[in-house]
Amino acid sequence: MDFFDLDIEIKQERLPAECSLNSPLNYSLSAQLTDRMTPRTENVRRQRERLRSHMREHFRVKDLSTLDNDSTRLHARLTEDLITIQSPEIDSSVLENWTPLKSYYASLDYTLPEKTAFKWEHAAPYWNLFAQLRAILLQSQKIKKQETGTRELYSCGPLQIEFVEGVVLYFTDRGSKEEFTKSGELPSVTPYADFLAWIKIISQRAQAVLMAVILRVTDKGLSPLPESLLAIYQNVDDILKRAGQPAIDLLKLWEPLVITKLGELLGDRFGLEEDFRNTIRGEATKLAKNLFISRGLNRLMDILDQQTDAQPLFQFFGLFKHFAYPRVFSRDTIQAIQEVSDRPSSISAVDFLHDQCEIRKEFYVRYINAYHRAPGLDLSALSPSSFLRDSLERGKIPNERSPLYSNKEWYFVKFTKSIEWPVSDTLSTFLSDKAITRDRPAWIEDGHSGRDMSEKRLLLKFIKENFSSVADIVGAAEAIYNNQEDRLIALKVKEMELKIKGRGFGLMTFMPRLLQVLRESIAKKTQKLFPEITMTSSDLDMKKRKFMLSKKSDDRRGFIHVNKSLDINKFCTSQRQFNSNAVFSSLDELMGTFPLFSRVHEIFEKTWIVDGSSSDPPNLAHFTRILDECTALGLDTPHIWADGVFSGLKGGIEGLCQYVWTICLLLRVERVMQKTALTHYILAQGDNVIITIIVPVEIHRDGTIPEQESRRILALSRDIDLSLESELEKSGLTLKIEETLTSENISIYGKDLHCPQHLTLAIKKAASAAIISSEQYQDVPTFLSGLGTSLEALSECVNNKVGVHLFGVIMGVAGWRDLATHQTWRGWRYPYHKKAITGRIRASEMKLSKGEPTELSISVLSKRRRETETLIELLSNSLLGSALGMLAFPTPLDLEKRGVGDYITHRLTIARKALLSGHLDPRIGRKVESACNIPLSSRTDLSKLFDSPFSLNIATEEDATAVIKRQATKILRLQEIKNEKLKAQIDNMDKGIATLDAALAGATNINPRLNYMIRSITDEKESEMFVTKFASARTMRTLAMNHSSELPIVILLEMKSQQKETYTIWRTKRPPVTMWKCSTVLAKELRDTSWGKNIIGGTSPSPIEAMETIQIDPTEWEDRRSQDAMSINYYLSRAGMDEQTAKLTRGFLVPYYGTQTKPLVAKAYLELKGNPRTNKALLLLSVRESLVKTGSNLDKLIIKLCSHALDIDVASLPALRAQEEAAAGEGLRGGIKESMSPVGPDNFYTNITHKVFNRKWATPYHVNIADFIIQGLIETRRHLLVNERMNGLLPVSSVKCTSCFRKKEREFFDIPEEFTWKNESKTSDPAYTYFTTWCDLPRVSNLPEMDQRSATRLLGRGLALNRSSSGEIITKFYSMPMESQRLLHPVELLLGYGEGVIFGYLRSQHINHGALFHIGDESLAKKLRRYVLDTKTQHAKQIGYLFQDEDSLHELLGQGLCPYIPRSIPLTITELTNACAITTIRATEVILSTKARIHHMPVQAIDESDVDTSRLAANTMQTILGDPRPMNLVHLDCDLTHNMVAWESEVELDILKSENFHIDGLLVELTARELPIGDTPWKQRDWTCSNDPKIIAKGIKTKSLFIHQGVTGAINLIPDLLVVIGGGLGGCAVPYLQEWPDTPIIFATLFDERERISEDGDLIVPPELLVRGMAPRMIEREILEAELCDITNEGNRRLLIRLVTKNKGGGKVVLIDEIENRGAPESLLQSSLQDLFEKLDKVCKLTSVHTVRESTVEQFSQRVNSIKRSRKAVTLHWNRYNRRDQFEALVIVKGEEAKSDYRISTITSAKAFRKIDEQLEIDGRLSSTQWSLPALPSREKNILFGYVSSVFLKMNLALSANDMDRERLIETIEGTAPGLISWKEKLEHRDHAHRSDIEEKGITQDKIFNLICLSWVLKGLRYGVWDTDAQSIVAQTVYITRGPKLCPLGEKPKRIFASFKLQSGKRVEDAKGFLSALLHLEGFFPLGEQ
């Protein structure tokens, strides 16, 4: 870890983008800045100009090219000079932190001596220099410039440093004698990044020396001398100073040189051959000679040669990692060299023995059971009585369950015949590989061939170990491979070859293997859609990703990263095809898992290898002895148990081959890459080679890449591909050029791969649920958790700081502990950014005043708290290995005896010990734990954790095998899967396989013609693999699910080949791989320029155009082609749906337009049209479809008729077999669905009816003639529905707008391609792409060119489609905040929004149904209205803010877009939602009616003053208590109907006097006769509106106008004062004011700005009635404000009583109580009311009218008793506006009534209601017309319409006043009512429907109830009969007839498509309420239209 976490401390924002920390250290940039090269980019040019002017001003330098800019030499020189002048005393900060240092060592059981014991003088110079430079760096980034004139200079000793424009100037202080920069007065110049790298190099050296110093005291043998480190550094500086940049190539060889020395020390064990050593040293010498620095090199080599200890020498690794280290030996390679040993997979000897036996058993079973070539068994080792021997001699497999069977005995069975298989054979096949075959003699005679000598040496290294000459090898190989007998068995291996780690299946059991295969096939399919997600997160892939991503950077504009992933043809062929095949394929056949084992190195990870050719296996005694010896010594079990048994073979034989090849390959690739002179990185493992190249490019200001640059990069990329190809050819490796992917060619959703955000998160989430990565089988928890995370977060965010941190964490988890300290040529790189720390540093900023250039000299080390933290970082990291590979503690390790790999293991052991010791500073402990990802739950997991250096995350106790054994079955059976997505996924998988099974079940023979066709269109490579995998998966799954352990292998193999064969039928051709012709950038530019014209690139239609269709006569096709006006919709089912969805969403199907199908198409249609037999058959078949669905047995009859009509032999049709199977098996429907064979030209007629919808299409284009017929059928059926008979032509529906044509249609009609943006991406459907692009917002930068109105329109469209929050969007488009801007052009905004909504609706249809169905404007309008209502909350979120602003509202109202002006702003949520919905509906209607362009629609506007007059003025207490301001009442109109404009002011006052309003009620007297009981507690009513006291009561309902009608007659007195409590705006007072126009009135109503409008669209009384009717009679404007009418407050009650007393004390007062409980406890409210009434009773003659509504009679009585003020009798007043579903009535308590203490009993109340019901029924029987209201004047019609429409709205039907015309209303209800039922989606797009299209399950009782009500209305409207007996209405059946249409109640049609009946009679009361409200319709449509 870097001692100072620079990236944390340094903010990069102040640096120009071109010179950020991550700029490449190249000459090019500084050369461009300093005039030695022409600047390549505009940015660099501008930067250079600024630099020039600075130099002219301060240094009088005209020509920058005179300056010294060789940073390599300069920094080497500076380091030398500055180190010499440093003080030898180390700065105190290190020593101050001695304590954590000591406790750290204590935790390792090690005591540090006192600090005085150390000699610091070696460490001091670098340490102090670093401290100074770091201080300069931090200061330079803190200072804030205030003036352009100010300069900041920093000094480090005599050196002056200045930062200008991303470059650093170095010059010597004039007073100083030394000239550090060697260029006199002139400064030297380097890029900022070079300066940073220099500092990081110094920092690294400081640490190294400090470590060395500490180690010299604590453990001499561990570390090199500090002197030798310093000497190396000094020599290197000297070399660099002399040779400059080229010398870095020499430093690249530093590690190989160290390796050569190590090899000498460790001897041959280390595996380095002499010639290899000489090569490396030779290379170095040659290079040094060329650079004239041989002496420097020799001095370095001397220092190396002085090191005679392996341990200190090992610490020299990594000293120069920060130079561009060429990966010739990548870090991984070195680790592989070190991995010379590892622990065995199982430590327990018994487990070992068991595994061992299992393996032998696998081999032997294979021999005995399957083939005659089984070797002889030597059973002499077994005792004659052995059960095993007995069974083997009889040639049987022993029965494991037998009590006699002993697992151990297997171990001692021996082969007698076997094949030798040493590694050299592998090489011999290498040597016979095609590269060498060209020139074999040359090899044998030790001549030369096309291969590099270096590669040859590497090969020879292996050969020498086994053979004396190459000729021997070839001879041996031929002998082996020509001998048929012995080709099969055992392995002969040497210990040395078993040490390289590989990865693979280990001892996976069947279940996980099975899961694996299935997963891979799923992933294979998904990969095409989501390439990044499906990459598996194996070790290798993590490496790949880490590699590719770590080379990227977010703040480097001007560079493009091109990643190439090489795909080499038949790499390792030799391993796969020759040697490994013998063993692996036998294993594969044994297990029926064909491709699994046969891949390279996949079996060896966990196995123990048995060498059959060895001497006898150890006897039991020998075995036990070894075991005991090890146990006694406390050793782990050894790798080699006996002669011929090995564990720990990690990747084994193949691993070695691969290792050799990897190196060969690397040398080749590196050679090609060096020629390009571009910065590049290579990662290689085996044939996986990834190259990252960084290419500088010129970019536009907005970040786009110009066309010519793109072309240049592509050309460059291709050149590299070609040169790689020819270079690799020399090694006999052929590159598959077309599959060598470059990020330039890969685009996902049209974005280039090197854009960071490829996919939206949502898609990722969905995808990760669908993919189970193939590496997640390790254990079940991983497997499940992998689903949630995948790596989506990683790919989403590695381009930002947070992402990098996350990435770091993931890498840590994957065991890449050195990531945090990864050094590259740039120095250090960190994945972490901690904002808090950055903030802390930035907080202490200095400010400079004007004036002189200021010089800041910084003291040698400022004391900062930071030191402790850094030290802790350093210590914690050294626990896991510091950057140097140094250890700060002793290693009692004998390197000669064990491999270097143990060294690492040993370190981890020590780390573990330290962690468990408890001495460790907790902060260090935490750091280490987080680096290792130790689970917090348990510290004891440490032992597992540190087992293997490669995977620090094995934090689970059980090993994979155990977990899988335990849980695989469960997973397969879907138990214990909590993850819903996963469950669904596995279900889906099962379903898919089941479907395939069923479809393939009967295919015993394959039609040869079909077979031929298939073969010609199969893509060999892919399908071979896929078919095989699939077949294996099927077979395995059968096994797993049946638990059939006894299944013989022969049957298995047979099953598999059968699966393979049948599956072949289904293979089809993939569409060819295409790329986007036109880059996304271009597409977006085209789109942006075309905004407002509704086109993209000149061709995209607007949604309105795209919806228009025309009908065409199919016979005229040929003629119409030339007119460019005809097309066919060819939306197909998408692949991968389940049958249900496919059946529902199949669109129109049209054939594949290829040359062969054209004639077929015409033929099919002509046949359909002209041939009466065909017509008849088609008609029959379509009938048959519905019959089959309903399971009718008429089916056979119909088939007969069909065969007669079509003249074909029914027996030849596959459908017949389906019939038989169905009858025998699963019932008709299931059978037919399950076993129909694929659609093909021979049998399409049969399949027409019911199969195609179930077809699983293998690709989106698997279409043939059958689909055509389907299209015909659909049209035919539609035709039949309309015309009832077949005649004339079948019309084809087609798009009018030619720009809507798709590619295939254009080909078919020979329409030339015009310039347009083509989407040829395989991954997305063209229509969808069109939608998304059309709706995408253009870049903001393009907006200023538009006029503001179109910009606003555009914004509206975006609002509707983009779903972000409104505030965001507004600020996105207008730079000013919303408040200052107000809202521009709200009308345009809304119309744009409307357009967007229409489009959004179409798009949603497209997404849901896989097709965009073209629908007429009329039906579209209805569907949109429905759609808007369904999504109304969303609209409120999007455009709600318009309604918070009065000006916008007036503008909208003036244009007729907004229905009303609410009386208060801000609105409540409910008001807002409703308003937005209506406004949106209105906007869409406008757009549809004007075909998308909007014309302002003047609607009669209202006068400003009227609106003002009617604004609500909220009155405060002061107003009530005597402020004489005039008072305005509210203007309110809050209905949900969209075309009610604001109320006109001319309202005749006498309207309310009109007869129409006079409604008589029923009066019933209730007398108190029951003895009073003690107070019963109040039950809280469950129907109260809301328990939130903040919500104030509803506005006046229309209802209250009506239910109080006629009460005045019942009261029969003229009061002196009217008091209204509750009741919203007091509408309840209006009927009283009709009678008593002069009575003064007091309002104590809930009357307030925030007053809420009820959700169901209740109307509010026209305010003029209130204004004109009541204002003059207000008593001193006595209106109590809302909070005062809360009469649960005693003060409010007192105030009310005071007002009454003051005005009419002692007079007659009528009180109207309309209070609804809004959340106060019931008892409190009732007692407060009682208290109020009783007190009022004392001050005046009080008559009170109460609205009482309760759900039970008991509660009704209780309520009446609480308000009757001890009167003996009260009067109930009921009229038909009261609800009948609850006990609701007005209770009149008269003042003059006699008093009595009795109570009114429940029985009395119940009788009263019964009397009311009887009275109603008598009235109803008298005459139905008596109930009708006379025709109303228009004004009241409007009022009532609000009431009626709100009831309809409750039934999901939105009506406008235009619909209030008898015929239209009938039509609307008939047509739309069936839509309330959940028909299947077919109904959405087609006018026909079948009985079977109604899902019975989806119909709730509510929906049926709604249907009944609507049906009742229909009857009333059509025949004038308005039934009032709710009981009988509810019991009736509703019918739906063809169309589908609703029938009037009681009418039964001839053709019933559906009928519904309520299941329960509970809805009677609801019906009373609904119907009494709907009865008002009678007033609109009286009999005979009077």
Swiss-Prot record:
Coarse class of the protein's main subcellular location: virion
Domain spans labelled Mononegavirus-type SAM-dependent 2'-O-MTase: 1592-1788
UniProt xrefs under Pfam families: Mononeg_mRNAcap, Mononeg_RNA_pol
Nucleotide-binding as UniProt keyword: yes
EC number: 2.7.7.48, 3.6.1.-, 2.7.7.88, 2.1.1.375
One GO molecular-function entry: mRNA 5'-cap (guanine-N7-)-methyltransferase activity
Keyword annotations from UniProtKB, A to Z: ATP-binding, Host cytoplasm, Hydrolase, Methyltransferase, mRNA capping, mRNA processing, Multifunctional enzyme, Nucleotide-binding, Nucleotidyltransferase, RNA-directed RNA polymerase, S-adenosyl-L-methionine, Transferase, Viral RNA replication, Virion
A GO cellular component annotation in the UniProt record: host cell cytoplasm
Ranges for domain RdRp catalytic: 560-757
InterPro entries for the chain: Mononeg_mRNAcap, Mononeg_RNA_pol_cat, Mononega_L_MeTrfase
Function: RNA-directed RNA polymerase that catalyzes the transcription of viral mRNAs, their capping and polyadenylation. The template is composed of the viral RNA tightly encapsidated by the nucleoprotein (N). The viral polymerase binds to the genomic RNA at the 3' leader promoter, and transcribes subsequently all viral mRNAs with a decreasing efficiency. The first gene is the most transcribed, and the last the least transcribed. The viral phosphoprotein acts as a processivity factor. Capping is concomitant with initiation of mRNA transcription.
Quaternary structure, from the entry: May form homodimer. Interacts with the P protein.
Family: Belongs to the rhabdoviridae protein L family.
Protein name from the UniProt record: RNA-directed RNA polymerase L
Originating organism: Infectious hematopoietic necrosis virus (strain Oregon69)
Gene transcribed to yield this protein: L
